[in-house]
Amino acid sequence: MSIRLPSLTPLLGALALAGTFLSAPALAADEVSLYTTREPKLIQPMLDAFTKESGIKVNTVFVKDGLLERVKAEGAQSPADVLMTVDIGNLIDLVDGGITQAIQSDTLNSVIPANLRGADGKWYTLSLRDRVLYVANDVELDSFHYEDLADSKWKDKVCIRSGQHPYNTGLVAAMIAHDGAEATEQWLRGVKGNLARKAAGGDRDVARDILGGICDIGIANAYYVGHMKNAEPGTDARKWGDAIKVVRPTFKNGGDGTHVNISGAAVAAHAPNKDNAIKLLEFLVSEPAQALYARANYEYPIRSGVELDPVVASFGELKVDSLPVAEIAKHRKQASELVDKVGFDN
């Protein structure tokens, strides 16, 4: 699939201005080691800019799977300074596994809302992934509650990926936090009854099947729409993206915020370069770094006021569910059990 990204040149130039928030330039020999489950190419421009402005070399180690196990096995001799991953569940697992440490940063605390960081400074959100409603262009719908997915009016009209995928167990966990386990079980049964096809595939497949007339609506992540609508004209991805619009749902019992998952990072428990690790995290939430990351990946920046990709901007302002994501994550196990109990993927 061919993706057309906006020009990053202006943003790379803007990153040169970000050095003003860094403390005195570090020695050229300074370094920081980043262990990340994210593809390095997605974050390399910011890391290069950080090195240019600070003199701190970033040693990037891509760990596709088993980040927790690797760092635990390395023990006190681990060279890891910063641990970066996606999904709040994965991040909390690193904390619970004892491989992160508490830090204090006024910069991070001022940029990142309290419900999107660890109260003890053991983890921080870097970007947001809102779980939204994909809607066929010919369906009139401007607002939606997640609970409405179980309404019989949508029978045979809903598409979604596996209920056991972390994107969906996260949403189910949020439903438990808002509405309770009993109501969430009934909701899951209602959603299953409204499915137009088996819960399977990926988020892009929701858009594909809306274009194909299989379903009218579906739950998926917003950033995929940025990728699809910015794909080359004539490609399948572009056709899928052009077939849908985005509505940000809210919870009936919980204000007017949308459920989000996150990408985030933490300082490793035995970080040999703790000060440099904190500097890197602070850089990653700076305005130009956030803008570059948001425009390259179409995720919503954690820092307010950052320029968005035009497609993402067209969705309107994101108001995040006020429940702390760490509180929602506590219900992940029960969410998975409920998905199995109702046979959601069968």
Write out the residue ranges for each language-model feature.
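Short beta-strand->loop
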Residues: Y35-R38, A119-D120, V135-N137, K155-D179, ...
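Periplasmic-binding protein-like
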Residues: K157-Q164, F283-S304
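A bilobed periplasmic-binding-protein/Venus flytrap-type ligand-binding module shared by bacterial periplasmic
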Residues: V132-V139, V260-N273, L292-R295
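Sec/Tat signal peptide C-region and signal peptidase I cleavage site
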Residues: L22-A28
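Ligand-binding pocket segment of bilobal, Venus flytrap-like solute-binding proteins
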Residues: A174, H178-P249
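A structural signal for short loop-to-beta-strand junctions that line the ligand-binding cleft
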Residues: S78-L83, Q101-V132, E147, C159-I160
